[in-house]
Amino acid sequence: MIRTHEAGTLRPADAGSRVVLAGWVARRRDLGGVVFLDLRDASGIVQVVAREGVAGQVASRVRAEFCLRVAGEVRLRPAGNENPELETGDVEVVADEIEVLSEAAPLPFPVTGPVEVNEETRLKYRYLDLRRPGPARALRLRSEMNRLAREVMARHRFVEVETPYLTRSTPEGARDFLVPARLQPGHWYALPQSPQLFKQLLMVAGLERYYQLARCFRDEDFRADRQPEFTQLDIEMSFVTEDDVMALAEDVIATLWSQLAGVELALPLPRLTYAEAMRRFGSDKPDLRFGQEIVDLTKFFAGTSLRIFQAPYVGAVVMPGGAGQSRSELDEWTTFARSRGAKGLAYVLVGAELTGPIAKNLSDAERAGLPAATGARPGDAIFFAAGEQRASQELLGAVRLEIARRCRLTDPASGAPAWSLCWIVDPPLFEPDGAGGWTSVHHPFTAPKPEWMDRFADKPGEALAAAYDIVANGNEIGGGSIRIHRADVQQRVFEVLGISEAEANAKFGFLLEAFRYGPPPHGGIAFGWDRIAALLAGVESIRDVIAFPKTASGTDPLTGAPTPITPEQRKEAGIDADPYAAAGRPPGRQSA
């Protein structure tokens, strides 16, 4: 073996022992006649002391991130020289042998201390970035997440199954990544956006309880904090209700939070209906760590003469202390609203009397009653949105979050809880597609709520889904549903969606065929594993918990991907081949 001990494991009990270590030079200090090295490996750091002699000569020429093998004796540090910041701070290794295993070129950025370099450079040298404590810690936390999830699944007698990465293209809302099939020129595989159809087939197969840590791929425009390839903990169960799936999901989440965040979640988690979440928070993934709930003022302004409030819906949200904002700060709110598609953002400032651009246009009764109607106090600001209900609620939801950011309402120092998790249940089954028809809010195999099972086609806009999302601190971390297993219900859903029988067979024929053979009632959930890891690691971006992530533009600075292919590769892959000419048949349904 190259080493006998790991650097970060040495303790006072090891004093007097001879050890052989291997690792990297995190820090070097030459005090003339004696050289101190901080030697780092995956377990931690220990101080190495090299005095005159061969070891000292070698130590005097090493530099940051040289890879070394060190042999010597563990000794207690002299009294007063202990380092409480290191777990090994009570001991040091007095080296009598130092071997340079490999040298390191000058670093593009330091791997100790703060890093002032752009993200693209960090990703280009990701292998160096991962030597830093934070990124390395995040990957180890993620590994623990995987272990704990598997323990929970095993306890509930689930079977871990790997589903295909090379499959056929099926519509799931985003574009597929396509892979040419060389042996069938002109034909293409698709990388799966999720294992949705395969896990339902496993339920038809009688497996009953399935899970996997599934890699998923979506070729979508990059926005917010997305990656083209991501991981989810994917779960499917037979003979279950919504409550059954949610109880299992809570076991997974409670285990993760207990073991990795030291937080015991109170179960069962609170549940809000989709309608309630939108009404109170303007979001289907509300952050419940703070208040500032939306106030519905539609009835309050029912007889108003103010034209902007003569709308189907009027709502407001209060900013504590907002009346003290400068004019430029108040103008920023208009810019904020316009960036979200609104014309602006009306407001009043609460003091001895109401002030602001619209205050003078309110009636005496409206001015007198508005503070009580909204719960605003002197010194607060009240922001309004009016118009179509959902759009107005979403704008106020965004304003609410911005208020929290500016007022630091989610800061534990302000009294906010560190964590707030909840379920959002009973979402719409369908939503308008913008062309006079309907589209599935989730996917076309989502079951209606039992009370809507026989009448969803009559009022698609009111029908509710047997679906559920789990939210943590305003982040959706998982979602699922009960699936349709009855052929007649599935056919009626397709009819609402405007999907003909021929189109359904072309897109989902293999699944519909399987459903002819006694499919069980089933449902499931998928957790956004990257997002959960980011939350538990306390980092802002999921890129910080992925070993080799892509940039916001979808590129990989480390490998240079994506890259062009050669003409020879293009020809060999059959990218330009006509599949119908090759098969000797006219255009139509392609073989699966």
Swiss-Prot record:
ATP binds at R218, D219, E220, Q227, E476, G528, W529, D530, R531. One of its GO terms (biological process) is aspartyl-tRNA aminoacylation. It is found in: Cytoplasm. Residues 196-199 are annotated as: Aspartate. It holds the Pfam family GAD. Homodimer. This is Aspartate--tRNA(Asp/Asn) ligase. It comes from Acidothermus cellulolyticus (strain ATCC 43068 / DSM 8971 / 11B). The lineage of its organism: Bacteria, Bacillati, Actinomycetota, Actinomycetes, Acidothermales.
